[in-house]
Amino acid sequence: MRKTNVSHLVDHFNMTILSGEEGLGREITVTDLSRPGLQLAGYYSYFAEERIQLFGLTEINFFQTLTPEERLERMNFLMQSQVPCFCVTRNQMVPEEMIDVSNRLGVPVLQSPLATTTLVGKVTNFLENRLAPTTTIHGVLTDIYGVGVLIMGSSGIGKSEAALELVKRGHRLVADDAVEIKQTQGGQLSGSAPELIQHLLEIRGVGIINIMTMFGAGAVRNVKNIEMVVQLELWEPHKMYERLGLDEETLKIMDTEIPIITVPVRPGRNLAVIIEVAAMNFRLKRMGYNAAMHFTRKQSNAILEDADSDL
């Protein structure tokens, strides 16, 4: 399970540390946030202590109505051992009881100028990105007409050369050789390049080239959602390859199924153009037009018409 900690949250959102600074190393393991209104009212049967606790205008104003003894009681309960931190929105003033218990138990209290709803959205997106399951796959990720295409195949089969030709044709490179893939909670896969090899492409016989330096900033992008996979393999004469495109196969990456097509490689085939057309065909299918199904219907209608004319 991936983790992050409170200090990463503070740095990313430039939050103010009000108290409990010694707890900045506390781990954050879930993306959900909690607004502990019921617990402030004295309901202790359930408390999501693994979540970041958020105090907006409602929570602070209600907390102010409690007696000093009740405030201490509520804070001692809320600042349990697994609570990562407390975030106070809109730069509100924080009650002394919260500061005192925070310093005593080492639970950070952070302050942000953002509105509560805005902070919830931003922190949730940040945590989903930091805590998303990750894997690394050998391949090349490109952006072709807005479609994220992951090109896979054995070493030396021509993935990088195809990517170079695609860049020359106006498409964009995301990652070459190693593609880091993250899976969001919705099952979407996003790919990027490790920082060390970002924007770099290796061509056998030429060496390593920097795509952004050579072709400009418009030829690269840092992150792209993966929508289809193209598997390159050496042509096998006795193997049956898909010719109509009616049967759709998928590849499982982590828990997500991605459409995959297999393209046989042999001398004289322009791989870049084939991959480009595959991406355009994918877009057409997504828009509701399937050329293979359209052809099949026309063929079936023609057969029926011939059968009727013979009667």
From Swiss-Prot:
Gene from which this protein is expressed: hprK
Misc. remarks from the entry: Both phosphorylation and phosphorolysis are carried out by the same active site and suggest a common mechanism for both reactions.
Catalytic activity: [HPr protein]-L-serine + ATP = [HPr protein]-O-phospho-L-serine + ADP + H(+); [HPr protein]-O-phospho-L-serine + phosphate + H(+) = [HPr protein]-L-serine + diphosphate
Family statement drawn from the similarity comment of this UniProt entry: Belongs to the HPrK/P family.
Quaternary structure note: Homohexamer.
Residues holding Mg(2+): S160, E202
Metal-binding among keywords: yes
Binding site for ATP: G153, S154, S155, G156, I157, G158, K159, S160
Uppermost EC category: transferase
Record's protein name: HPr kinase/phosphorylase
Entry's EC annotation: 2.7.11.-, 2.7.4.-
